[in-house]
Regions:
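Residue-level detector of alpha-helix initiation sites
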Residues: 86, 151-152, 176
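N-terminal glycine-rich dinucleotide-binding loop that anchors FAD/FMN and/or NAD(P) in oxidoreductases
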Residues: 114, 184-212, 251-262
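Ferredoxin-type iron-sulfur electron-transfer modules and their immediate structural context
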Residues: 1-144, 236-263
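Short amphipathic alpha-helical segments
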Residues: 159-160, 182-183, 246-250
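Glycine-rich FAD pyrophosphate-binding loop
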Residues: 166-182
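N-terminal Rossmann-like FAD-binding beta1-loop-alpha1 element of flavoenzymes
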Residues: 143-169
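Feature captures the FAD/FMN-dependent oxidoreductase FAD-binding
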Residues: 76, 139-140, 144-148, 200-248
Length: 263
């Protein structure tokens, strides 16, 4: 068992120098090095009650994956993450950990919580850069499910179902999969090719089929999917893609953009 690191504060995240990043749109946060990740992981107390797990929307076994990092078993950590999430590199970057897992971390009572999101990101990035093995496809269970929308919820459902042996097809209205991950989060926060595209590729490797430029209700209907194409269930994850307006004068003037358009 690795020796605990009782530092009160997180290991700082390396970032682009301001004089460099003000001239590009590359990712600002650069991620932990191997040694930084191991050192930060050793701050985890592996609490008996695991409040961080209860606060995680997908119930990742956080202490277990962090313990693997602390013991320098990065692929073991990735295997634990993969049991609960198909998008660890995305979630490690953009999930609001401060309100979820890290918000409940015992280390945060006196000092800073463990950098759970940073460690999740490190594990996912390390696996992507060092492991070339495709995910193991489970045995098909003979059931067929349609997923409407290739945003984070659709990708998550598709990945989870594929791991259980379901034959899954995602129908996406736009020409690229990813939803808000592609169209709503800036490149400097979430790189599209380096991260999002690679996460989607992993979902495809599980056997999930993607059909883009398909508008449900126009190109086809839910009834047709179930009655004519043999889908036994449909998950609707169409997202909240339309911007909200305040209804004030000048909103439609030239040069006025919604938040969606701006991002």
């Amino acid at each position: 068992m690795a020796e605990r690191n009782m530092d009160m504060n997180k290991c700082p995240m390396p970032v682009q120098d301001p004089d460099v990043r003000n001239k590009n749109f590359d990712e600002v946060a650069l991620g932990y090095t191997y040694d930084m990740a191991v050192n930060e992981a050793r701050r985890c107390l592996n609490c008996k009650n695991k409040p961080c797990v209860s606060a995680c929307p997908v119930q990742i076994n956080i202490p277990a994956f962090i313990e693997r990092v602390a013991n320098e078993d990065i692929e073991g950590a990735f295997a634990i993450l993969s049991e609960s999430t198909s998008l660890p590199a995305v979630c490690g970057r953009v999930c609001p950990q401060e309100n979820q897992c890290e918000g409940k971390c015992v280390r945060g009572i006196k000092g800073e919580p463990v950098g759970i999101g940073r460690l999740e990101r490190f594990v996912a990035d390390y696996h992507r850069e060092h492991c070339t093995d495709a995910p193991v496809k489970p045995e098909p269970n003979g059931h067929k499910v349609a997923v409407i929308g290739a945003g984070p919820s659709g990708l998550t459902v598709a990945g989870d179902l594929a791991k259980l042996g379901y034959k899954v097809t995602i129908f996406e209205a736009l020409h690229l999969a990813g939803g808000v991950l592609v169209y709503g989060i800036p490149e400097f926060r979430l790189p599209k090719q380096k991260v999002v595209a690679k996460e989607i590729e992993k979902v495809k490797e599980l056997g999930v089929k993607f059909e883009t430029n398909v508008v449900i209700g126009k190109s086809t209907t839910i009834d047709q999917l179930m009655e004519e194409e043999g889908f036994e269930a449909v998950f609707i994850g169409s997202g909240a893609g339309l911007p909200m307006f305040m209804g004030i004068p000048g909103e439609q003037a030239n040069g006025v953009f919604s938040a969606n358009e701006y991002l």
